[in-house]
C-alpha cells in the first residue's frame, strides 16, 4: 500500500472545492497528455525559447510546433513575447512547471542513477 494512514494535517476540502480542483487538474493533465506538448513544457521549464530554438531542441516541424504551442497558449500554460521578428515562449503556469518537475524526478532522474 502506498499510503496506509490518512494524513490529518492537510485541511479538509469541501466536495465543491474538491470537484473544482479535480476539474482544474484534469484539464491541465489533458493539455499535457500530448507528447509534443509535454516535451515543449519540459523544455520551457528551463526558460524562455524562440520558436526556432524550440523547433531545433524538440526536432519537430513548424506546422506541428505552431499547432501545439497554440494549444498551450490557449490553455494559459505559456505566453509569448515578440522581439522584432522572433517570437519567444515561456511558461506562465507554475503548477505545470511543478508537475513537469515531479514527472522528471519520477521518470527521468531515476534512469540517470541506474
UniProtKB/Swiss-Prot annotation:
Domain of life: Bacteria
Keyword annotations from UniProtKB, A to Z: DNA-binding, Repressor, Transcription, Transcription regulation
HTH arsR-type domain: residues covered: 17-111
One cellular component term from this protein's GO annotations in UniProt: protein-DNA complex
Entry GO MF terms: DNA-binding transcription repressor activity; transcription cis-regulatory region binding
SUPFAM superfamilies named in the record: Winged helix' DNA-binding domain (SSF46785)
Annotation: DNA-binding region: 51-74
InterPro entries for this protein: ArsR-like_HTH, HTH_ArsR_DNA-bd_dom, Metal_resp_trans_reg, WH-like_DNA-bd_sf, WH_DNA-bd_sf
Disulfide bonds: none
Its job: Represses an operon that comprises itself, XF_0764, XF_0765, XF_0766 and blh. Binds to a palindromic AT-rich sequence spanning the -10 region of the blh promoter and blocks transcription of the operon.
Alphabetized PANTHER family for the sequence: ARSENICAL RESISTANCE OPERON REPRESSOR ARSR-RELATED
The protein's name: Biofilm growth-associated repressor
Species this protein is from: Xylella fastidiosa (strain 9a5c)
Amino acid at each position: 500500500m502506498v499510503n496506509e494512514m490518512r494524513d490529518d494535517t492537510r485541511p479538509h476540502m469541501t466536495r465543491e472545492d474538491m470537484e473544482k480542483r479535480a476539474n482544474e487538474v484534469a484539464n491541465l493533465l489533458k493539455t499535457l497528455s500530448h507528447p509534443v506538448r509535454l516535451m515543449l513544457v519540459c523544455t520551457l521549464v528551463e526558460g524562455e525559447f524562440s520558436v526556432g530554438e524550440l523547433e531545433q531542441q524538440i526536432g519537430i516541424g513548424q506546422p506541428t510546433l505552431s499547432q501545439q504551442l497554440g494549444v498551450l497558449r490557449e490553455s494559459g500554460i505559456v505566453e509569448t513575447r515578440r522581439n522584432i521578428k522572433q517570437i519567444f515562449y515561456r511558461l506562465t503556469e507554475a503548477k505545470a512547471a511543478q508537475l513537469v518537475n515531479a514527472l522528471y524526478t519520477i521518470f527521468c532522474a531515476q534512469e540517470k542513477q541506474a
